[in-house]
Amino acid sequence: MTDAAGTYRLIGAFVDELVRCGLRDACTSPGSRCTPLVLTLAGDERLRCHSHIDERCAGFFALGLAKASALPVALACTSGTAVAELLPAVVEAHEARVPLIVLSADRPPELREVGAGQTIDQLKIFGGFAKWFFEVGTHETTSERLRWIRALACRAWATAREGRPGVVHLNFALREPLVIDALPPLEGQGRADAAQLLQRSPQRGEDREAAARLRELIADARRGVLVAGRHERATLLGRAAAAFCESVGWPLLADPMSGARRGRAAIAHYDALLRAPGFLAERVPDVILRVGDLPVSKPLRTWLQALTDIPQIALDPECAYQDPAGVVSDWLAAEPAATLQALVSHGTRIDSDWLEGWRSADERAAEAILSVLSTDDLSEPAVAAELGVLLPRHATLFVASSMPVRDIETFWPVRSDPPRVLCNRGANGIDGTVSSAFGAAAAGDGPVVLLIGDVALAYDLGGLLAASRLDLKLTIVLLNNEGGGIFDFLPVSGSPMALADDLYTRHIATPTGLEFAGAAALYGLSYETVSDVPAFRAALERALAGRGSAMIEVHGERTANMELHRRAWSAVSDRLR
């Protein structure tokens, strides 16, 4: 048997075991040294193999797919800078707790540090952002080696998925020759029988000790608040949080990415309410329960940070310690949905006026915001509000960081059946957003809409190639306000130093000046631009009903957008007086 054939047998056994563990999707990018990895993955008919021309897009595509499917995705690349291109996606996956299995090809040890081409130090290249690193040598193909590499695949799958999900990096040192005439048959090689070597632990359920401790902590609470941050991994959290709050009479302040902005206890406009002078004076809670990641809303984070004398209890199965202000008094390592469900039957309404006061204020805030957005003019807040109403429950909204995710937080309504909302909020970057959204679309769980600004779209224009190359459908709603609108809300926008010689516009706001209709045509997306609410509704309906990917562009102006936000917040304050 040639060395190449032995390499393919080992990699074939490795991939076969990943598939037996549950692997469904793999992403590849071209190269020579990675040939055995790519051909083995692409040749396995049980896998969906998504081919990309560059590694950065491939990494973010795999990230979005893993987010949407809640399963690890394999990601194969060649040696050299190709591996380094994956770092941004690996960082986001680590911070957002998304499982990825990176399979990098490398030169064998004798070709390292001797000037061989396309050879860099790939060992632990991702540093602490990889949950586990392992250097894989192929060597001889013995029965012992086949058993070992299957066990390695099981360990990689389990490590990526169990506990705190994250990134596993396996570095394959591959010697030439790298090609053979045909893939060798597996026939269960390396197994004594057909039993899976890995038995995945069942999904964590109610932690009785944690539930008992939580029941004790909130037993005397008359005025509690539940804050639900992004928790994309817990599909049942939304319903559990809503049911719990309704049973105990607590307001539910839920980020749309938590899936919990539903039910009669949900307060949709807390971001605007918490900005209103005097609103909080009569609404001091005696306990706060926190689930999920830190909320996007700065007023909410500021309020939580100020409540240093109020018990704040965090439910987090991995105890990720998302508490930069150090105000959490109790950490309970428990699965939030199961724990809240266990407490519903034990909850008693303690102070009905407490929740009704929040709900009344929320209704007045909704009326105030509607009065500001009541015209047919299409603004960025109006787009966020319209998407919250128009998207079907089985849809997914992928939101870019920066202004789009903040507008969703502020203007997204309460619904009994909200669509899923995803966003790369682990490290909060705007890079790779288009590719991540296409990855979510590849999961095949209903229509996917991407809400994105012009700078974030320009950052990842290459990601649009997935529309034609992978035959995927994505509806892109582009908010084009000629630059990074988020900076207009920050102190730098009024800095005399930044405003001198127009430094703010050129170096901070950075308008792109691009005609995105040309980009849509280049990558095969249908395109239309809209300027009023009825036209937007019609365009969205056409895009969702159509076959291919589409881009709907909404033009705006940054200064007008900032003023509209301020008018909305001011209207809420006036309505509460």
Role assignments for model-derived ranges:
Residues 24-28, 48-50, 68-107, 284-292, ...:
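A short, small-residue-rich loop immediately preceding and capping a beta-strand
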Residues 11-14, 19-22, 29-33, 37-38, ...:
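Active-site diphosphate/adenylate-binding microenvironment
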